[in-house]
């Protein structure tokens, strides 16, 4: 259930980000989501990697192809979920079915993007791949630190709440 909820929230966040980006964006050649997709993939995955101009062009081509092949976010599914959430009578089974449907669509998009990232990774030299893998390990360590901090903060909060109530 947590996975379904997370996927639904991610989809909702993506759509709201895209709608905001569409309002802010200008220019005839701007495609909603293009900047967001490019920034999220390149700023995280390829930070600290020096790419040749040829590699950059190949990656741009892969991203452009992926954008055109990827199905858009299904706005009607989000509208359906909104109607279920705001309904007079809450129907858990209907919400669960809708959430699973939306989660499956999100999974399909993530798999497609993983394929593109794999193709981009294979464009790198062995040295660039080593740098990328090192950067990844550093990010994972940072995430572990944050997770550990969150756990310890939650435990402190719980223990201080228990001592006050006694």
Swiss-Prot record:
Signal peptide bounds:
1-21
What does altering residue 61 to E/V do?
No longer inhibits Cpx pathway
- Taxonomic superkingdom: Bacteria
What result is annotated for mutating residue 107 to G/N? Decreased protein stability, wild-type degradation of PapE
> Where is this protein primarily located?
periplasm
InterPro entries reported in the protein's UniProt record: Cpx_auxiliary_protein (IPR052211), LTXXQ (IPR012899)
**What's an example Gene Ontology biological process for this entry?**
regulation of proteolysis
Region annotated Important for protein stability, probably interacts with CpxA sits at 55-61
Task: Tell me if Signal is a UniProt keyword of this record.
Answer: yes
Describe the processing and modification events after translation: Degraded by DegP; some CpxP mutant proteins are more susceptible to the protease than others. Degradation probably occurs when CpxP is associated with some misfolded proteins; overexpression of PapE leads to DegP-mediated degradation of CpxP and PapE, which requires the N-terminus of PapE. Overexpression of NlpE does not induce this degradation however.
| Pfam families (UniProt xref) | LTXXQ (PF07813)
Annotated spans, Not required for activation of CpxA or to induce degradation of misfolded P pili subunits: 151-166
Q: What is its subcellular localisation?
A: Periplasm
* Gene3D superfamilies linked: 1.20.120.1490
Give the keywords, sorted.
Answer: Periplasm, Signal, Stress response
The entry's stated outcome for residue 128 to H is:
No longer inhibits Cpx pathway in wild-type cells, protein more susceptible to DegP, in the absence of DegP protease partially inhibits Cpx
What inducers act on this gene?
Induced by envelope stress such as overexpression of misfolded periplasmic proteins. Induced by alkaine pH (tested up to pH 8.4). Induction is decreased in a degP deletion. Transcription is stimulated by the Cpx two-component signal transduction pathway; sigma factor E (rpoE) is not involved. Transcription induced by spheroplasting, which removes the periplasm and thus this protein; if the protein is anchored to the outer surface of the inner membrane induction does not occur. Induced in persister cells.
Query: Cellular component GO terms, alphabetically?
Result: outer membrane-bounded periplasmic space
What phenotype is described for loss of this gene?
Hypersensitive to alkaline pH (greater than pH 8.8). Increased accumulation and toxicity of overexpressed, misfolded periplasmic proteins.
Q: Per the entry's comment, what about the domains?
A: A region in the N-terminus (residues 55-61) probably interacts with the periplasmic sensor domain of CpxA to inhibit its kinase activity and is also important for CpxP stability. The homodimer has an elongated cradle shape; a hydrophobic cleft on the convex face may interact with periplasmic protein PapE.
NCBIfam families, per the entry: PRK10363.1
Q: How does it assemble?
A: Homodimer; it might alter shape slightly at pH 8.0 when Cpx is induced. Binds the periplasmic sensor domain of CpxA. Interaction with CpxA is not seen in vivo when cells are grown in 0.3 M NaCl, or if the misfolded P pili protein PapE is overexpressed.
UniProt similarity note: Belongs to the CpxP/Spy family.
Q: What does this protein do?
A: Acts as an auxiliary protein in the Cpx two-component envelope stress response system, helping modulate the Cpx response systems response to some inducers. Binds the periplasmic domain of sensor histidine kinase CpxA, inhibiting induction of the Cpx envelope stress response in the absence of inducer; overexpression decreases Cpx pathway activity. Some periplasmic stimulii (shown for P pili subunit PapE and probably 0.3 M NaCl) increase CpxP's susceptibility to DegP, leading to CpxP degradation, inducing the Cpx pathway. Aids in combating extracytoplasmic protein-mediated toxicity.
Protein name from the UniProt record: Periplasmic protein CpxP
Q: Which organism is it from?
A: Escherichia coli (strain K12)
Which gene name does the record give?
cpxP
């Amino acid at each position: 259930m947590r996975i379904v909820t997370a996927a639904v929230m991610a989809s909702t966040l993506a759509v709201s980000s895209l709608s905001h980006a569409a309002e802010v964006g200008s220019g005839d050649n701007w495609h909603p989501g293009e900047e967001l997709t490019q920034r999220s993939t390149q700023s995280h995955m390829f930070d600290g990697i020096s790419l040749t101009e040829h590699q950059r062009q190949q990656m741009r081509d892969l991203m452009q192809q992926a954008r055109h092949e990827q199905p858009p976010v299904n706005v009607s599914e989000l509208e359906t979920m909104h109607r279920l959430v705001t309904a007079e009578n809450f129907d858990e089974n209907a919400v669960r079915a809708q959430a699973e449907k939306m989660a499956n669509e999100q999974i399909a998009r993530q798999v497609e993007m993983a394929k593109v990232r794999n193709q981009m990774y294979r464009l790198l030299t062995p040295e660039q791949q080593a740098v990328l893998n090192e950067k990844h390990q550093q990010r994972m360590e940072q995430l572990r630190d944050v997770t550990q901090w969150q756990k310890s903060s939650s435990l402190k909060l719980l223990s201080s709440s228990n001592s006050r109530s006694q």
